[in-house]
Protein backbone atom coordinates (compact mmCIF):
# COMPACT_ATOMS: atom_id res chain seq x y z
CA UNK A 1 0.00 0.00 0.00
CA UNK A 2 1.31 3.42 -0.93
CA UNK A 3 0.00 6.72 0.36
CA UNK A 4 0.83 10.04 -1.30
CA UNK A 5 1.14 13.49 0.17
CA UNK A 6 0.06 16.48 -1.88
CA UNK A 7 0.72 20.19 -1.39
CA UNK A 8 -2.18 21.91 0.38
CA UNK A 9 -2.87 25.19 2.19
CA UNK A 10 -1.23 23.58 5.18
CA UNK A 11 0.16 20.19 4.30
CA UNK A 12 -1.34 17.45 6.43
CA UNK A 13 -0.84 13.70 6.06
CA UNK A 14 -3.63 12.31 3.87
CA UNK A 15 -3.68 9.11 5.89
CA UNK A 16 -4.38 7.98 9.42
CA UNK A 17 -1.12 6.93 11.15
CA UNK A 18 -2.99 4.26 13.12
CA UNK A 19 -3.70 2.39 9.89
CA UNK A 20 -0.08 1.35 9.59
CA UNK A 21 1.71 -1.21 11.66
CA UNK A 22 5.35 -0.72 12.56
CA UNK A 23 7.44 -1.15 9.45
CA UNK A 24 6.02 1.52 7.14
CA UNK A 25 8.77 2.94 4.94
CA UNK A 26 8.70 6.65 4.15
CA UNK A 27 10.32 7.33 0.78
CA UNK A 28 11.53 10.90 0.58
CA UNK A 29 12.47 12.12 -2.89
CA UNK A 30 14.62 15.10 -1.99
CA UNK A 31 13.77 18.61 -3.22
CA UNK A 32 10.95 19.21 -5.72
CA UNK A 33 9.01 22.04 -7.32
CA UNK A 34 11.00 25.27 -7.53
CA UNK A 35 13.72 23.67 -5.42
CA UNK A 36 15.44 21.49 -7.98
CA UNK A 37 18.47 20.75 -5.83
CA UNK A 38 21.80 20.26 -7.58
CA UNK A 39 22.20 20.52 -11.34
CA UNK A 40 24.49 18.08 -13.14
CA UNK A 41 27.23 19.06 -15.56
CA UNK A 42 24.90 18.08 -18.40
CA UNK A 43 22.01 20.13 -17.00
CA UNK A 44 20.02 17.35 -15.33
CA UNK A 45 18.07 18.44 -12.25
CA UNK A 46 18.58 16.48 -9.05
CA UNK A 47 14.93 16.56 -7.94
CA UNK A 48 13.81 14.73 -11.09
CA UNK A 49 16.39 11.98 -10.63
CA UNK A 50 15.47 11.64 -6.96
CA UNK A 51 11.82 11.23 -7.87
CA UNK A 52 12.49 8.66 -10.59
CA UNK A 53 14.46 6.48 -8.17
CA UNK A 54 11.87 6.95 -5.41
CA UNK A 55 9.02 5.82 -7.66
CA UNK A 56 10.96 2.75 -8.74
CA UNK A 57 11.79 1.94 -5.12
CA UNK A 58 8.13 2.27 -4.17
CA UNK A 59 7.12 -0.09 -6.98
CA UNK A 60 9.61 -2.72 -5.83
CA UNK A 61 8.48 -2.47 -2.22
CA UNK A 62 4.93 -2.96 -3.48
CA UNK A 63 5.90 -6.32 -4.94
CA UNK A 64 7.05 -7.43 -1.48
CA UNK A 65 4.07 -6.05 0.40
CA UNK A 66 6.08 -3.40 2.21
CA UNK A 67 3.78 -0.52 3.23
CA UNK A 68 5.14 2.80 2.01
CA UNK A 69 4.47 6.51 2.15
CA UNK A 70 5.76 8.66 -0.70
CA UNK A 71 6.27 12.22 0.50
CA UNK A 72 5.89 13.33 -3.11
CA UNK A 73 5.00 11.47 -6.29
CA UNK A 74 5.47 14.35 -8.75
CA UNK A 75 7.57 17.48 -9.21
CA UNK A 76 6.04 19.45 -6.35
CA UNK A 77 7.06 21.18 -3.16
CA UNK A 78 5.17 20.47 0.05
CA UNK A 79 5.22 24.09 1.21
CA UNK A 80 2.25 25.97 2.63
CA UNK A 81 0.45 28.39 0.32
CA UNK A 82 1.47 31.25 2.58
CA UNK A 83 5.13 30.74 1.66
CA UNK A 84 6.17 33.26 -1.00
CA UNK A 85 9.93 33.39 -1.48
CA UNK A 86 12.00 30.39 -2.50
CA UNK A 87 13.59 30.33 0.95
CA UNK A 88 10.19 30.40 2.65
CA UNK A 89 9.00 27.57 0.42
CA UNK A 90 12.07 25.46 1.19
CA UNK A 91 11.69 25.97 4.94
CA UNK A 92 7.96 25.25 4.83
CA UNK A 93 8.49 22.18 2.67
CA UNK A 94 11.03 20.69 5.07
CA UNK A 95 8.90 21.42 8.13
CA UNK A 96 5.91 19.75 6.50
CA UNK A 97 7.97 16.69 5.61
CA UNK A 98 9.13 16.46 9.21
CA UNK A 99 5.54 16.77 10.47
CA UNK A 100 4.33 14.06 8.09
CA UNK A 101 7.08 11.68 9.22
CA UNK A 102 6.62 12.40 12.92
CA UNK A 103 2.89 11.70 12.61
CA UNK A 104 3.65 8.05 11.86
CA UNK A 105 4.29 5.29 14.37
CA UNK A 106 7.95 4.25 14.18
CA UNK A 107 8.51 4.59 10.43
CA UNK A 108 11.75 4.01 8.58
CA UNK A 109 12.82 6.87 6.34
CA UNK A 110 14.81 6.45 3.13
CA UNK A 111 15.67 9.89 1.77
CA UNK A 112 17.00 9.94 -1.78
CA UNK A 113 19.44 12.58 -2.99
CA UNK A 114 22.32 13.12 -5.42
CA UNK A 115 25.77 14.44 -4.59
CA UNK A 116 27.92 17.07 -6.26
CA UNK A 117 31.43 18.45 -5.77
CA UNK A 118 33.65 21.06 -7.44
CA UNK A 119 36.01 18.32 -8.62
CA UNK A 120 34.62 15.88 -11.18
CA UNK A 121 36.81 12.98 -10.05
CA UNK A 122 34.60 11.88 -7.16
CA UNK A 123 31.96 9.21 -7.69
CA UNK A 124 30.02 6.54 -5.84
CA UNK A 125 27.09 6.28 -3.45
CA UNK A 126 27.29 7.46 0.16
CA UNK A 127 24.88 6.60 2.97
CA UNK A 128 24.23 8.97 5.87
CA UNK A 129 22.20 8.10 8.95
CA UNK A 130 20.27 9.95 11.65
CA UNK A 131 19.73 9.15 15.32
CA UNK A 132 22.87 7.16 15.92
CA UNK A 133 22.61 3.48 16.76
CA UNK A 134 18.93 3.41 15.83
CA UNK A 135 19.76 3.86 12.15
CA UNK A 136 23.35 2.66 11.89
CA UNK A 137 22.61 -1.04 11.18
CA UNK A 138 20.36 -0.14 8.23
CA UNK A 139 22.94 2.36 7.01
CA UNK A 140 25.67 -0.29 7.14
CA UNK A 141 23.56 -2.80 5.26
CA UNK A 142 22.60 -0.24 2.62
CA UNK A 143 26.17 0.93 2.07
CA UNK A 144 27.34 -2.67 1.76
CA UNK A 145 24.68 -3.61 -0.79
CA UNK A 146 25.31 -0.47 -2.86
CA UNK A 147 28.99 -1.37 -2.94
CA UNK A 148 28.25 -4.95 -3.98
CA UNK A 149 25.70 -4.06 -6.65
CA UNK A 150 27.03 -0.80 -8.08
CA UNK A 151 30.72 -0.35 -7.39
CA UNK A 152 32.91 -2.94 -5.62
CA UNK A 153 35.68 -0.33 -5.33
CA UNK A 154 33.53 2.08 -3.34
CA UNK A 155 35.01 1.91 0.14
CA UNK A 156 32.94 4.67 1.72
CA UNK A 157 31.56 4.00 5.17
CA UNK A 158 28.13 5.07 6.44
CA UNK A 159 28.43 8.46 8.10
CA UNK A 160 26.37 10.38 10.64
CA UNK A 161 24.34 13.01 8.84
CA UNK A 162 25.72 16.56 9.07
CA UNK A 163 23.94 18.96 11.40
CA UNK A 164 23.08 21.15 8.40
CA UNK A 165 20.58 18.61 7.02
CA UNK A 166 17.34 19.91 8.53
CA UNK A 167 14.97 17.02 7.88
CA UNK A 168 17.27 14.30 9.16
CA UNK A 169 18.04 16.26 12.32
CA UNK A 170 14.41 16.95 13.20
CA UNK A 171 12.94 13.45 13.04
CA UNK A 172 13.14 10.87 15.81
CA UNK A 173 12.81 7.63 13.84
CA UNK A 174 15.13 5.29 12.00
CA UNK A 175 16.35 7.20 8.93
CA UNK A 176 18.99 7.07 6.24
CA UNK A 177 19.84 9.54 3.50
CA UNK A 178 21.34 8.05 0.36
CA UNK A 179 23.46 10.19 -1.94
CA UNK A 180 23.15 7.87 -4.94
CA UNK A 181 26.05 9.32 -6.89
CA UNK A 182 27.83 12.46 -8.05
CA UNK A 183 26.15 14.66 -10.65
CA UNK A 184 29.51 16.40 -10.99
CA UNK A 185 31.12 13.24 -12.38
CA UNK A 186 30.54 12.92 -16.17
CA UNK A 187 30.13 9.14 -16.21
CA UNK A 188 27.96 8.98 -13.12
CA UNK A 189 25.88 11.90 -14.36
CA UNK A 190 24.88 9.85 -17.39
CA UNK A 191 24.30 6.71 -15.33
CA UNK A 192 22.03 8.48 -12.87
CA UNK A 193 19.83 9.67 -15.74
CA UNK A 194 19.61 6.14 -17.15
CA UNK A 195 16.41 4.18 -16.55
CA UNK A 196 18.35 0.94 -16.17
CA UNK A 197 20.72 2.41 -13.59
CA UNK A 198 17.83 3.95 -11.66
CA UNK A 199 16.21 0.50 -11.52
CA UNK A 200 19.51 -0.95 -10.33
CA UNK A 201 19.74 1.66 -7.58
CA UNK A 202 16.17 1.13 -6.48
CA UNK A 203 16.64 -2.63 -6.43
CA UNK A 204 19.76 -2.26 -4.29
CA UNK A 205 17.98 0.01 -1.82
CA UNK A 206 15.01 -2.33 -1.57
CA UNK A 207 17.24 -5.36 -1.20
CA UNK A 208 19.23 -3.70 1.56
CA UNK A 209 16.09 -2.83 3.51
CA UNK A 210 14.56 -6.29 3.07
CA UNK A 211 17.74 -8.06 4.16
CA UNK A 212 18.06 -5.68 7.12
CA UNK A 213 14.46 -6.38 8.12
CA UNK A 214 15.04 -10.13 7.90
CA UNK A 215 18.13 -9.82 10.07
CA UNK A 216 16.22 -7.84 12.68
CA UNK A 217 13.33 -10.33 12.66
CA UNK A 218 15.81 -13.09 13.46
CA UNK A 219 17.15 -11.10 16.39
CA UNK A 220 20.57 -10.77 14.84
CA UNK A 221 22.73 -7.65 15.17
CA UNK A 222 24.50 -6.04 12.24
CA UNK A 223 28.01 -5.44 13.49
CA UNK A 224 29.81 -5.41 10.16
CA UNK A 225 31.47 -2.07 9.48
Regions found by a protein language model. Name each.
Residues 1-225:
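Catalytic-site microenvironment of enzymes
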Amino acid sequence: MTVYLQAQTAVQPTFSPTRFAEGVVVIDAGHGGEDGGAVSISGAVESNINLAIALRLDAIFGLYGVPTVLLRDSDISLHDEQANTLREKKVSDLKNRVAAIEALDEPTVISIHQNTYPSSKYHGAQVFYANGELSLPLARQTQAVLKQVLDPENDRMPTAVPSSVYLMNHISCKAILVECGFLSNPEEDQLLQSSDYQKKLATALAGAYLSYRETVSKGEILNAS
